[in-house]
Amino acid sequence: MASVIIYFSHRGENIVNGHPLFLSKGNTQVLAEKIHKLTGAVLYEIKEKEPYSEVYEYVNERARKEYETNALPEIAGIIPSLGNFDTIYLGFPIWYRTYPRIINTFIQKAEIKGKIIKPFCTNDEGSFGTAELELASYLKGANTVKAGLSVNGYKLDECDAALEKWLSK
């Protein structure tokens, strides 16, 4: 069987080392592309139907509201068939100390039952926050969720050794 890299990423203003910085390509996309280069896995980007603002403050506020209301933001486009894949590398930024709720939308609409899920995230703090626990809970035992990889967005150039180690597990 084969692997697929499914990720949600955000372009726009981000906070890097406490300072605002505009990103033309989201950190999670950069990490997903690194995984693709090392594995050859198919890439699929989750895109939101209603785009997030490029202003960090507004993205953070929307993420908080979506988290608190368990919102399921709509996905733009068609969700691919995943029947030919046994492993899903699932990537996202950490927003409001967890994964964006659009990941739940994807989980509900995609055919992921029985898949191996290998989560990866980018963040400014170096941790998954509560994302790994929440993701495992949301998947409710229907999948095997492996240990994830968390990378500081501003250290993407320094993560190759950790990435290769994670991929080998």
What residue ranges belong to the model's regions?
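Active-site-adjacent alpha-helix of alpha/beta-hydrolase-fold enzymes
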Residues: 26, 136-142
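Glycine-rich, charge-decorated loop segments at or immediately adjacent to ligand/cofactor-binding or catalytic sites
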Residues: 125-138
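Conserved strand-to-helix beginnings and helix N-cap segments that scaffold or border functional pockets
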Residues: 100-103, 129-132, 157-160
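Glycine-rich phosphate/pyrophosphate-binding loop and the adjoining helix
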Residues: 144-169
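Short, conserved loop/helix-junction motifs that constitute active-site signature segments
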Residues: 82, 108-114, 139-141
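Solvent-exposed loop/turn segments at secondary-structure junctions
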Residues: 11-13, 49-51, 94-97, 124-127, ...
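N-terminal beta1-alpha1-beta2 submodule of the flavodoxin-like/Rossmannoid cofactor-binding fold
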Residues: 1-87, 97, 104, 161-168
